[in-house]
């Protein structure tokens, strides 16, 4: 389970699903789900449903800012990191200069950290700089597509 002050385990979805089956409760799978094969795999391993987040970041209807959208397609970004540096609670995003510098010393403390970094993030977004703001993205960000959300969801559900 996710608790705001707990360091996320980093276990892959398939490992979490295998362990969760023992509890006999409905499980909503999330994390690393970016295509129909991942949906099929999660459902086949016992998930009752699948939730996506990153898969919709480039949807036409998403509120993803232009700096974030460009970064999701920019080859300079090669990895993700789980950090609390932007908001004071853990979330996964593209590794950038801000995470490299501040993640090692970032305190937990949402919403205070989020409020303190808000003006910084707004300024660097206005300047078009992807290295001073959060670029939320999951591990499968390279597999996501742009287009209408309905088309993205239809592609995810293609085999069901």
State where each predicted segment sits.
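Conserved active-site-proximal phosphate/metal-binding subdomains
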Residues: 1-26, 34-160
């Amino acid at each position: 389970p996710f608790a705001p002050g707990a360091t996320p385990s980093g276990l892959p979805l398939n490992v979490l699903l295998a362990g969760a089956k023992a509890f006999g409760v409905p499980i909503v799978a999330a994390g690393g789900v970016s295509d129909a094969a991942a949906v099929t795999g999660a459902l086949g391993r016992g998930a009752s449903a699948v939730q996506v987040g990153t898969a919709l970041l480039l949807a036409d209807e998403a509120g993803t800012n232009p700096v974030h959208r460009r970064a999701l397609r920019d080859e300079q970004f090669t990895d993700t990191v789980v950090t609390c540096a932007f908001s004071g609670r853990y979330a996964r995003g593209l590794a950038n200069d801000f995470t490299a510098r501040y993640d090692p010393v970032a305190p937990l403390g949402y919403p205070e950290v989020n409020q303190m970094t808000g003006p910084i993030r707004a300024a660097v977004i206005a300047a078009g700089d992807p290295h001073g703001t959060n670029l939320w993205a999951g591990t499968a960000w390279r597999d996501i597509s742009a287009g209408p959300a309905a088309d993205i969801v239809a592609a995810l559900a293609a085999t069901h």
